[in-house]
């Protein structure tokens, strides 16, 4: 069982060709599709589905949801990177469990005010030594998980932003013969995973002067699903 949309471990040698050409490897196999999702709203499915299909090498799927949310994309433009995130966490945690997701392990150090919060090795976040149902994880670690609401941080256009612009190590051309036909295919799948961790809303925590190309694309193509919030 697997999902080519969530194939995000090429750095460890995983090959998307196994999904794309499954019957070439197992000619007697029967492929069954799971078409219903019980986590995401119809709107998130539509947004994420349109986003991932910009990749050339993905299997087109029709997914169904039984819930609807009017504007699940919350664009939060901050003035103070740490203070405004503190405010946002306190607001969102009152609505249920929260995942704070980012592209890189070290991103949280720039964003979280450690004078207010504490964080353990598992990414659990504490306020006054009390767990507040908020976790910080990289998107890779969050695969398979869910929360009532998700906050995405470090959505900037830079080498270590999202998408991450580091080039693959040369060794991968020897261990993995699959080639991306457009730039950032794996990063796009990773962003898809981030978008689909939420049961309700996604909060994009944004620096108005430096915004990820993925976020710009989401904004351009999904304006009716977006609520803008200025801190």
Placement of each model-derived feature along the sequence:
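C-terminal/domain-terminus segments
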Residues: 205-231
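Conserved nucleotide-binding/hydrolysis micro-motifs of P-loop NTPases
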Residues: 4-8, 13-16, 37-41, 105-107, ...
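Conserved helicase/translocase motor-coupling segment
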Residues: 80-149, 154-156
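Inter-lobe coupling/hinge region of RecA-like P-loop helicase motors
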Residues: 28-36, 57-103, 134
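Short glycine-/polar-rich loops that comprise or flank the Walker A/P-loop
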Residues: 3-5, 26-31, 70-72, 132-134, ...
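Conserved helicase C-terminal RecA-like lobe
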Residues: 94, 142-208, 216-217
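Short, aromatic/basic amphipathic alpha-helical patches
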Residues: 22, 109-120, 212-222
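Conserved RecA-like helicase ATPase core segment
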Residues: 1-71, 167, 215, 226
């Amino acid at each position: 069982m697997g999902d080519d949309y969530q194939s995000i471990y090429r750095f460890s040698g995983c090959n998307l060709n196994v999904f794309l050409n499954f019957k070439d490897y197992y000619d007697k196999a029967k492929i069954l599709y799971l078409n219903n999702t019980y986590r995401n709203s119809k709107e998130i499915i539509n947004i994420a589905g349109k986003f991932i299909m910009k990749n050339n090498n993905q299997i087109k799927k029709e997914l169904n949801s039984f819930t609807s949310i009017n504007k699940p994309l919350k664009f939060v433009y901050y003035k103070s990177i740490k203070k405004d995130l503190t405010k946002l966490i306190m607001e969102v945690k009152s609505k249920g469990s929260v995942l704070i997701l980012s592209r890189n392990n070290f991103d949280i150090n720039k964003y979280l005010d450690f004078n207010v919060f504490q964080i353990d090795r598992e990414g659990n976040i504490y306020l006054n030594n009390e767990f507040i149902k908020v976790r910080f994880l990289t998107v890779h670690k969050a695969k398979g998980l869910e929360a009532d609401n998700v906050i995405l941080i470090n959505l900037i256009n830079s080498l270590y932003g999202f998408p991450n612009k580091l080039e693959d190590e040369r060794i991968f051309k020897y261990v993995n013969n699959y080639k991306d036909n457009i730039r950032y295919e794996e990063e796009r799948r990773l962003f898809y995973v981030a978008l689909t961790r939420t049961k309700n809303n996604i909060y994009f925590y944004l620096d108005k002067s430096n915004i990820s190309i993925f976020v710009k694309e989401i904004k351009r193509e999904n304006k009716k699903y977006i609520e803008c919030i200025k801190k």
